[in-house]
Amino acid sequence: MKTSTDRILTTHTGSLPRPKPLIDIVLGREKSGALDAGVFEVATAKAVEDIVAQQAAAGIDVVNDGEMSKPSYTTYIRHRVSGIAPDPRAAEQGRDIMVGRDLLAFPDFGVRGQRSNFAATPFPGCVGELAYQDRSALDRDIAHLKAAAAKAKPAEVFMTAPSPGILTRFIINLHYPSEETYVAALAEVMKIEYRAIVEAGFVLQIDAPDLGSARNNQYRHLSDDEFRSKIAERNIAALNAAIEGLPADRMRLHICWGNYEGPHTHDLPLLKIIDIAFKARVQAFSIEAANPRHDHEWEDLKTIKIPDDKILIPGVIDSTTNFVEHPRLVAQRILRYAEVIDRERLIAGVDCGFGTAVRTEPTVADSIVWAKLAALSEGTAIASKTLWGS
């Protein structure tokens, strides 16, 4: 993984605005199950080529495919893994799992919350033994990103995949005897995707909101201590089993508290989860650091010892608002984190994705996404000048 040797590098979190024709294709498949493979292939290849070029033009160093081919960052695996299918029981349980404590605390806001990223998602269920049966979609994603990167020539390339833990929230278990056996089964199938991404030469980003937002909704009935000991520790152990044998410096972990504009008053504090997260055998950690409930936590991180082999990727751009951050504010946020960790182990990022699920209208307008990423690049240049003096 490239580090910030003479300036702060820039990256983002994953999903980016999809072109309307591709949205229609992906959404049509989700609704009817029908897909014209040839049309989808052409549309995806073009979308990935364009999105990588746009990232490079915006000044992003570590780019990805924008998750162009995926209906969401989690549920896409039902097209690759057997044992997953639509089921009305899963849909019912899924709706309950998505009810967060903050939405319960503010019921008048809860109505708005029903329009969040996954409010319209018909959660599939795990209805049989899991097996990674079809690598063709994964191989196409890899090929498209390689081709696009060869043209744009970014500093580095990453590709996302969900953690075993977060999949328990979006693929409802209707088959395995316990959540523990289910997480283990998910880890076993996901290791195929993790390894393929690393072997393709990409940095693997593992999306793990199960360490943050799941406390607020899926496990709202537990105490913080119970969540840490029973859920977070288990999920990190499952993840480590899935990435066993992969080089730590080719992986990064994304932790977030739910990519929605809402109160977030019941978010688990970063200090209550980061120690467990650091047990993940990855090098870099992407965290929310721009939204108003977590912007202050750089001060908390100053109170702990960050392992010498770890890199931080704080979000210095908020992914849930149409405000375009001023580059000087971006620089200020980066400089705060330069007080937390050595400048060489700091990469500037975004809190979360901009196109989390195709079924929901994005919160941030497409044109504003690119203005935000340009502000990220400009602000990072300002901070780099301060940190390196040139």
What do these predicted ranges mean?
Residues 1-390:
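Domain-level signal for soluble alpha/beta catalytic cores
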